[in-house]
Amino acid sequence: MKSGLAHQTRFKIIAGDPARFRHAVVARHNNGYPMPLPPSASRTPAPIHMRDVKYRGYARDDGMWDVEAELIDQKTYDIELHGRRKVPAGKPIHHMWIRLTIDADMVVHGIEAAMDDHPLGHCPQATKSMQKMVGCCIARGWRRAIADNLGGVVGCTHLRELLFNMATPAFHTVLNQFGNNGSGLPPRHLGQCLGWDFNGPGVAEFYPEFKDWKPQAQQQLRETTTQA
């Protein structure tokens, strides 16, 4: 408890100057973002750290799709990065963007990355390696491809995090990938979570033809289709 009180006291001291920003953050949280979680223990009224991530999907005139990702990290108090550069409250520590251009098969045809804000001067060099993801498929082996092509010091931790989760908005953008295309196979999102469990009520209600579907049956059907 002492540690928590000390932390709150320190927060009040170092957050003295950007009070207006903190007030805006609290107001936004209270008025625009009601919290459905149960009440927490006593804590600072404004968050210490905020990370906002947004994904957007667009249909292109050439038949492709663009999926864009944006990441912003902010503090509600002034900080010094590595004891040198001062970053005021509300100014992003990280502000990064990615655009993927994909086809109907979820294959990456183009990728662009940019860093508006970053902690070190040479961080943007990590965007060059992003081109290695061209030709990779979001639908299969996506996380492995990211680890193989952008892992460790080759890439950027935050760009990798954005890429990891671009698969879901990509599927939501290319809507026909969720439908039944007459192949006899279930849509790709079935069997991937509790809500769409083949043995659950969701599939029984909305996809009764795939109720109690077995993955091995799916594999056998794929092999038969390929051979034909």
Model feature map: region roles:
Residues 16, 26, 211-215:
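Short linear sequence elements within intrinsically disordered, low-complexity coil regions
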Residues 3, 15-18, 31, 190, ...:
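Feature targets compositionally biased, intrinsically disordered low-complexity regions
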Residues 38-66, 72-81:
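N-terminal intrinsically disordered, cationic/polar leader segments
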Residues 37-38, 71, 75-228:
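Active-site- and interface-proximal helix/loop "cap" or "latch" segments in soluble metabolic
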Residues 13, 20-25, 29-33:
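Short, positively charged and aromatic/hydrophobic N-terminal segments
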Residues 3-4, 9-10:
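N-terminal amphipathic/hydrophobic targeting modules at extreme N-termini
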